[in-house]
């Protein structure tokens, strides 16, 4: 599956879902992924976040479908178990050349390796095992690490995670990742009113002190107990206001396909980002789909149905058939989500079942 997605132009892979570092063989998995070389698309935005190659979203482009990245669920094993990220336009324009079957040659696995730049590989983790694994992952070919945490105060962190001493382990992991060259390390914090909005400024201070990029994420209706309500969301404007009272921010230009709005502190020390799918949806520039750990493609976090890729694989579908299926699914990607609207229907899976 990795070879197929790379042949379609995928340039980025993120391993996520549960805790990837618990998976046996994750270092070797990264090593194998690092051997692939993206095919078929030239970047139109050469300097995206952290210097990574970006493909500018172009839903109005006559070229139509343009794949960019993969978010890889960690629950499946082997290179046929990767999730994909792809971007498409609504108007079913003709496929770009890279998607035409006659231009997708059935090449040996080795022929798509060792040419050009490698895939941009990242992992999202809770960080508890990162201290010991950062250097092996870097040596295997990993480029970046994102750590998920909802508090930067040690006592609060322990109450949330129920892991005594956990904050020190995670902090050591982030520092090890930074020292290994897996940076800038990103920290994702989901904000929920009445739970951890008092951590906004402490996280900003943490970004400055530790040299990490903190990204605040608006709380979305994807939780198991369905407690989401508009009042639980801490919106982008409030985050900026609270942070601005601590220290002025300057917005940083970013690629349109980036999910986060990026800001630097006025003295140049420290960066934060805000991912605001509720108050400022970015559906029009979304460049991602996922494959869940049970082999289902989801074109949006809030999809009310899945597309069963695993069933095709189980029944012996050829590479061309799998590629055509993926393309067809992406062409059906939702225009937007409907969070907060009267006709909003909750996603068919909660976040824990989607994977990170």
PLM region descriptions:
Residues 2-14, 23-38, 112-215:
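Radical SAM/AdoMet-radical enzyme domain recognition
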Residues 17:
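Catalytic-loop Lys-Pro-X-Asn motif of eukaryotic-like protein kinases
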Residues 35-117:
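Intrinsic disorder/low-complexity segments
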Residues 155, 163-273, 277, 311:
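Radical SAM enzyme [4Fe-4S]-AdoMet core and its adjacent flexible, acidic
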Residues 280-356:
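Radical SAM enzyme core and accessory elements
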């Amino acid at each position: 599956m990795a070879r197929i997605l790379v042949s379609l132009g995928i340039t980025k892979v993120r391993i996520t879902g549960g805790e990837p570092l618990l998976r046996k063989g994750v270092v070797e998995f990264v090593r194998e992924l690092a051997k692939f070389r993206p095919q078929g698309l030239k970047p139109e935005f050469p300097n995206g976040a952290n210097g990574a190659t970006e493909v500018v979203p172009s839903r109005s482009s006559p070229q139509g479908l343009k794949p960019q990245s993969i978010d890889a669920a960690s629950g499946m094993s082997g290179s046929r178990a990767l999730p994909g990220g792809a971007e498409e336009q609504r108007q079913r324009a003709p496929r770009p050349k890279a998607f035409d079957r006659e231009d997708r040659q059935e090449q040996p696995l080795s022929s798509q390796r060792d040419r050009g730049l490698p895939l941009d590989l990242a992992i999202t983790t809770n960080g508890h095992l990162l201290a010991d694994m950062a250097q092996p992952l870097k040596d295997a070919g990993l480029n970046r690490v994102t750590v998920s945490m909802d508090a930067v105060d040690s006592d609060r962190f322990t109450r949330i995670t129920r892991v005594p001493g956990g904050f020190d382990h995670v902090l050591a992991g982030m520092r090890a990742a930074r020292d290994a060259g897996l940076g800038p390390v990103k920290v994702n914090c989901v904000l929920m009113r009445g739970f951890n909005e008092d951590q906004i400024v402490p996280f900003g201070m943490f970004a400055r002190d530790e040299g990490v990029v903190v990204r605040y994420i608006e709380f979305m209706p994807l939780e198991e107990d369905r407690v989401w309500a508009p009042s639980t969301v801490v919106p982008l404007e409030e985050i900026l206001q609270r942070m601005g009272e601590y220290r002025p921010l300057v917005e940083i230009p970013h690629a349109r396909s980036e999910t986060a709005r990026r800001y630097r502190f006025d003295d140049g020390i420290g960066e934060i980002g805000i991912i605001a799918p509720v108050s400022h949806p970015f559906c029009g520039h979304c460049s991602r789909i996922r494959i869940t750990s049970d082999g289902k493609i989801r074109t949006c976090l809030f999809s009310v149905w899945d597309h069963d890729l695993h069933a095709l694989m189980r029944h012996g579908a050829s590479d061309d058939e799998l590629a055509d299926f993926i393309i067809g699914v992406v062409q059906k990607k939702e225009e937007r989500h409907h969070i907060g609207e009267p006709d909003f229907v909750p996603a068919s899976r909660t976040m824990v079942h989607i994977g990170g």
